[in-house]
Each structure stands twice: as C-alpha cells, then as structure tokens.
C-alpha cells in the first residue's frame, strides 16, 4: 500500500520488536498511523479502509471489523505452520489484527527493513531457499521512528497507570512498562534522552496529538508524569505485569522481573529530568486540526519540515 502512495506508517509494539530484531514480547498485531490531514471526512474514511481492508494474501473476517470516526480495525485469519493450543483464550494464533488510526500525527518516520522470523533465524543456505522457492525476503516499510515510539509509550504508560483501577488499563500499562524497560538502553534512546532539541520536537508532536485523544492525558505536562514511581506502588499494576509476562513474554530469558522494570523506570525518570526540553515542555497552542498537511525530509540529524498552506486541499482520493 505504501508503494501505491498510501500515507500509512507502521507503529506500535510489533513495529518496535521488528525494529529491535527481536520478539521479546509477543506482538503481531499491525498498528498503522494514517496521515489524513487536509482530507474530508469521506477521504479520511477511505484512507483508513484502504489501510486495513484491501489486503488479499489472507482472508478477512468482516464480522470482526470495527469502525469509528478516526479508527478502523480489521481481522484476517491464517493457518499457523506450527502446533498451537486451539483453545488458547488469548487468541494469539490464527488471527492477525490490523488497526489504523488517523487521530495520530504520522511523524517522524524512517525506512525500516522488516523480515519474517523464520528468515531471521535461517542460515545463509536456508535464506537462499526461502528467497528463491517461497519469495520470503526482507523488505522496506515506512515506520514511525524508534524515538517517537519511545515517547508514545511514555505517554501511554502514564495514562494507563493513572487509570489502572479501570478494567484492562493495568494490563495495558504493564505492556508499556515492559517495553520501556527493554528500550531504555538502546543507543537511539540513550541519545534521545540527552538531546534536548530532538526531545522538544517529539514532545511538541505528541502533546499536539494528545489534544485529540479521547482516552489520553491532554492536560498533563511531561514533567508532571507520576507513573515512574506510582507503578511500583499499585498492586493491580504489579499483578497485571506478572500476568502479562506469563502470557506474552514466551521465553524465560526475556522476562524482566517487576522490581527490575521499576528500577528501569526510575533510571528513565532521572535521565528525562535532566533533559531541558522535558522540563520546559508547554501545552500546544494549536490542535491537530489546525496543523497544515506537511511532508518531511528525513535525515539522521533532524527532520526538515516543508509545510503547506492550510487553505490548500489534498487531491481527492483515487
């Protein structure tokens, strides 16, 4: 779809673990951020449906589709090639969910090489067979950057920990806490937490996006985040974390004890507190709808913005 010009970008947990070249936490749902700025309602809906319902490699189950104003979810079925528990209550196997949202701001992005796990684990001879006989090979996908995913997870963890007494919120918080603990020592994240300019750009994007979220924390500034310490003192979060690891962190060596994860949050908090942009971040002056459509030229050192006038509309969807 990206090759055909669809402005949809890979994000979320599955994108994270594809970027890290590991499957430490089981995640195969595909989350997409779809850029619909400057689009009419009809064009918005068309882009979301195109991002979720137009794939032909797997059969789609229309009965499981969900459509909201700025979100479309589709579920595709497949037959796993390995043995699995057919009564698995979590339905982790045999179904692939694709979720596309347009309330998110699709920037910054980068090209990510993605490959199937079977390819990653194969030796050179096996890879040649996979390529020549089965067409299994790495490919490029436009993806929300690792640094932006990290910022998103900070905000998500704060929102879910604050509401951890509500059903399912503690479990969602647990997944983000685990991911943050995994990401903390990645070189790109270490650099981000020391880079005030990059931090400021990402926080401005996320704070603007937060204004549009129905289940977010639009009135909370980054320096007011409390989940770094609160998570360790909420029994429902601790319980959910242990459950999440049993269900989604399939290898024992990939599991992180809750105390170690809490310590990782403390270290993240200390590093963020030393970042001027984190401390001085302010509420955005415009909402997502006020932002003009834009294209971005990516580089290792920054993202050059080339704005378009708000009065100019995008071409109608073809």
PLM regions with names:
Residues 1-8, 18-24, 35-287, 306, ...:
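Structured mid-to-C-terminal alpha-helical surface segments
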Residues 289-304:
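Long, low-complexity intrinsically disordered regions
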């Amino acid at each position: 779809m990206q090759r055909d010009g669809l402005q949809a970008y890979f994000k979320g947990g599955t994108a994270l673990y594809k970027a890290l070249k590991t499957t430490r936490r089981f995640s195969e749902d595909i989350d997409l951020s779809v850029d619909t700025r400057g689009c009419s309602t009809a064009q918005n809906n068309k882009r979301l449906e195109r991002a979720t319902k137009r794939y032909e490699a797997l059969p789609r189950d229309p009965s499981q589709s969900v459509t909201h104003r700025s979100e479309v979810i589709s579920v595709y079925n497949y037959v796993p090639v390995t043995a699995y528990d057919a009564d698995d209550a979590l339905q982790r196997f045999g179904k692939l969910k694709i979720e596309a949202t347009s309330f998110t701001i699709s920037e910054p992005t980068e090209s990510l090489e993605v490959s199937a796990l079977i390819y990653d684990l194969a030796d050179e001879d096996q890879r040649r067979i996979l390529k020549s006989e089965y067409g299994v090979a790495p490919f490029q996908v436009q993806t929300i950057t690792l640094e932006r995913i990290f910022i998103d997870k900070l905000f998500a963890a704060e929102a879910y920990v604050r509401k951890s007494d509500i059903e399912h919120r503690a479990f969602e918080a647990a997944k983000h806490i685990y991911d943050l603990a995994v990401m903390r020592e990645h070189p790109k994240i270490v650099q981000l937490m020391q880079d005030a300019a990059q931090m400021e750009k990402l926080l401005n994007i996320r704070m603007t996006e937060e204004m549009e979220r129905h289940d977010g924390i639009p009135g909370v500034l980054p320096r007011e985040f409390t989940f770094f310490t609160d998570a360790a003192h909420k029994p429902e979060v601790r319980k959910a974390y242990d459950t999440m690891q049993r269900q989604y962190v399939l290898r024992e060596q990939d599991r992180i004890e809750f105390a170690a994860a809490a310590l990782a949050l403390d270290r993240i908090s200390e590093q963020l507190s030393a970042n001027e942009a984190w401390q001085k971040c302010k509420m955005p002056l415009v909402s997502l709808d006020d932002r003009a459509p834009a294209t971005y030229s990516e580089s290792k050192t920054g993202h050059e913005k080339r704005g378009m006038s708000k009065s100019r509309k995008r071409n109608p969807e073809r």
